[in-house]
């Protein structure tokens, strides 16, 4: 019997929920899973209501969050533009013991991230969260890590750094680790550079502006690489997510996810002039 994937969302008619079903149906483990129940807390202004959305995407509208959790084998908590609601929307799922994927950004603060993992561990619930940019072909092939880079630079765009900065921080932490001792930010909401200094002296830098593509440059004593694009990010993310759903083992250490949430919290505080 195929495992059922359930969706929980703030409002269901959004880009991730609209595209994940197609990628689930094309993924390497597609024959082991099927899309099941979906629920939204509210309908987005101008968006499709749940029943209409489900009809178009081949899912079943649920009457409550509880119904999704009870009738699913694995659960996606979406709301990719609203990390402030993730802890609330994921609460029942994190008590279920079933694999739960929480969309990016995982949490609005490091403390919230810690609480979510603590709740998941209390109920023995496997938990995973990631930006798709961790899973670009160019980062998965191992060449960047093989350089043992002393400096790692990313660029990226999107509507705002608050929402899209997660992508660059995910790439940085996945390649460079979590031991960041200092952080500086220059710029404003339209353009900025964020510099991370690691405890061992390594450096990482993220540059943001609306139209910048997602790129990576890395260098160390073994050489240098310039990667002008990140390819197949979402397809690779979905493949890893489905393996997680099948095994109950997250491919990402929780320490990285918590660190990324903390770094995003700190960097946006610097951006907006908060201490």
PLM regions and their residue ranges:
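C-terminal helix-rich "cap/oligomerization" subdomain common to oxidoreductases
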Residues: 2, 52, 56, 60, ...
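C-terminal active-site/capping subdomain that shapes the small-molecule cofactor and substrate pocket
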Residues: 7, 210-275
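A general structural signal for well-ordered alpha-helical segments in protein cores
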Residues: 17, 113, 139, 168-169, ...
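Rossmann-like dinucleotide-binding domain that binds NAD(P)(H)
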Residues: 151-213, 255-262
């Amino acid at each position: 019997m195929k495992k059922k994937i359930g969706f929980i969302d703030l409002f269901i008619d959004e880009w991730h929920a609209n595209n994940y079903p197609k990628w689930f149906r094309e993924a390497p483990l597609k024959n082991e899973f099927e899309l099941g129940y979906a629920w939204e807390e509210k309908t987005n202004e101008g968006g499709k209501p749940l029943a209409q959305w489900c009809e178009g995407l081949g899912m079943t509208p649920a009457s409550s969050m509880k119904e999704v959790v009870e009738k699913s084998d694995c659960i996606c908590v979406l709301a990719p533009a609203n990390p402030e609601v993730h802890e609330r929307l994921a609460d029942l799922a994190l008590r279920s013991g079933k694999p739960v994927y929480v969309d990016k950004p995982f949490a609005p603060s490091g403390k919230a991230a810690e609480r979510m993992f603590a709740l998941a561990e209390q109920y023995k619930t496997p938990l995973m969260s990631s930006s798709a940019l961790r899973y670009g072909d160019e980062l998965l092939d191992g060449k960047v890590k093989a350089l043992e880079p002393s400096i790692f630079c990313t660029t990226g765009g999107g509507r705002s750094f608050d929402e899209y900065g997660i992508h660059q921080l995910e790439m940085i932490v996945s390649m460079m680790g979590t031991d960041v001792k200092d952080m500086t930010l220059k710029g404003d909401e339209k353009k900025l550079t964020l510099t991370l200094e690691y405890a061992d002296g390594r450096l990482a830098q993220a540059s943001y502006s609306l139209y910048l593509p997602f790129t990576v440059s890395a260098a160390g004593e073994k050489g240098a690489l310039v990667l002008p694009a990140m390819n197949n990010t979402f397809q690779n993310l979905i493949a890893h997510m489905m393996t997680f759903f099948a095994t109950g083992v997250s491919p990402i250490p929780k320490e990285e996810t918590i660190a990324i949430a903390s770094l995003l919290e700190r960097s946006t505080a610097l951006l907006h002039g908060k201490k």
